[in-house]
Amino acid sequence: MKRIPILVDKKYSGHWFDQKKAIRFDSNLSGMDWLSDFHEAMYLTKSNTWIWNEFTFGNDGDVDSDKYFKSDENFASKWLTRHRVDIQNYEEVPQTVKDSIEKIVSKMEV
């Protein structure tokens, strides 16, 4: 399944697209909704927007992303998912996570 990352300003809602479905979600951190059979987790970028992609979650709520992502993506996605309610802007993200996010964003076609 082809995943298309969408840049979404955090003031607005966004859509996740595959070849057959469009899923609307709330891009507000504190109001994050889990929809359909897909689970969404977030990335933060320098422009303080969200990039959303599909993840699967284990019973403990941690991201089981090894089969989707390489080391940088795995590290950043796990950290951001665990702290998603606590992070209000990019400045609060630790530098090690920012470095991983930058590598992810640089590889994405948006």
List the predicted regions and their residue ranges.
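Short, exposed beta-strand/loop patches in secreted or surface proteins that constitute
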Residues: 15, 41-43, 69
